[in-house]
């Protein structure tokens, strides 16, 4: 009986290897370095002045670039 269970366990492990299971580290939320690269660019910043092509001083304080003179 025990040998049958061992054979069944080995077959299951061969058919469904643990490497096929996605790990938590593969989730985008767990990779902050890549997530920060996807931040809003200045052109899409809500305070970006498209006519002047720059951000007002208040928006520059919040990280919008380039700043208007």
Curated annotation (Swiss-Prot):
Pfam families: Conotoxin
Post-translational modification comment from the UniProt entry: Mostly non-hydroxylated.
Transmembrane segments: none
Tissue: Expressed by the venom duct.
Gene Ontology MF term list: ion channel inhibitor activity; sodium channel regulator activity; toxin activity
Region (Disordered): 22-43
Origin: domain of life: Eukaryota
Keyword Nuclease in record: no
Name of the molecule in the record: Mu-conotoxin-like Am3.1
Lineage: Eukaryota, Metazoa, Spiralia, Lophotrochozoa, Mollusca
Signal peptide, first to last residue: 1-20
Compartments, as annotated in UniProt: Secreted
Positions bearing Cysteine amide: 68
Primary role: Mu-conotoxins block voltage-gated sodium channels (Nav).
Propeptide: 21-52
GO CC annotation, single: extracellular region
Modified residues (4-hydroxyproline): 66
The keyword Flavoprotein appears for this protein: no
Biased composition (Basic and acidic residues): 28-43
Domain comment, as recorded: The cysteine framework is III (CC-C-C-CC). Classified in the M-2 branch, since 2 residues stand between the fourth and the fifth cysteine residues.
InterPro entries, per database record: Conotoxin
Protein family per UniProt: Belongs to the conotoxin M family.
Record key words, sorted: Amidation, Disulfide bond, Hydroxylation, Ion channel impairing toxin, Neurotoxin, Secreted, Signal, Toxin, Voltage-gated sodium channel impairing toxin
């Amino acid at each position: 009986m025990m040998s049958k269970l061992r054979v069944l366990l080995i077959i299951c492990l061969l058919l469904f290897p643990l490497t096929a299971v996605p790990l938590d580290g593969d989730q985008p939320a767990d990779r902050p370095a890549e997530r920060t690269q996807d931040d809003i660019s200045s052109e899409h910043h809500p305070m970006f002045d498209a006519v002047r092509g720059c951000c007002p001083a208040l928006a520059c304080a919040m990280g919008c670039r380039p700043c208007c003179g």
